[in-house]
Design a protein with these regions (language model features):
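N-terminal helix-turn-helix DNA-binding core of bacterial DNA-binding proteins
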Residues: 24-65
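Basic, amphipathic "hinge/linker" alpha-helix immediately C-terminal to the N-terminal HTH DNA-binding motif
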Residues: 34, 85-108
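Generic leucine side-chain signal with a strong bias for well-ordered alpha-helical environments
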Residues: 30, 40, 66, 70-73, ...
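Short histidine
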Residues: 10-13, 19-20, 38, 42, ...
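Canonical helix-turn-helix DNA-binding module
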Residues: 52, 56-84, 88
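Amphipathic alpha-helical dimerization/coiled-coil segments
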Residues: 104-132
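N-terminal leader segment of winged-helix/HTH proteins
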Residues: 1-33
């Protein structure tokens, strides 16, 4: 702990000779999920939203932005797009295994936000569907 009560600074490793820009898995991950809308789309997917209009309504996101983010998530195998209705044709978006494995990251962001950014404490209660 830092004397001011904040977290202690971590000293950089000076003996590491790796090109961090090329080898950084954090940077590579942020290329996929690093913008506000993408994280919120993933949050809503974990909440059970599946269809374009559901995401649009919940997030109040411009249609073109939502279409772009969903397309990118599908291209990167974080979500899969499946037809769920034939007439008219409608699609749903579901998390892949890769997408599901983002769960701890979203939970960590929520916990960090609850701790450091929320004046009233935790606004969200997580309940596991199978365990209650």
């Amino acid at each position: 702990m830092h004397p001011t009560g904040g977290p202690a600074a971590v000293a950089p490793a000076h003996d590491v000779h790796v090109d961090l820009a090329a080898a950084c898995s954090i940077a590579a991950s942020l290329d996929i999920v690093g913008d506000r809308w993408t994280i919120l789309i993933l949050r809503d997917a974990f909440r059970g939203l599946r269809r374009f209009d559901e995401f649009r309504r919940d997030l109040d996101i411009p249609r073109a932005v939502l279409a772009d983010r969903l397309r990118r998530l599908v291209e990167r195998d974080v979500m899969v797009k499946r037809a769920c209705q034939e007439r008219p044709v409608r699609y749903e978006y579901r998390l892949t295994r890769m997408g599901i494995e983002l769960s701890p990251i979203l939970v960590a962001l929520m916990q960090w936000g609850d701790r450091w950014l929320s004046e009233d404490g935790a606004p969200t209660l997580l309940v596991h569907e199978a365990w209650g």
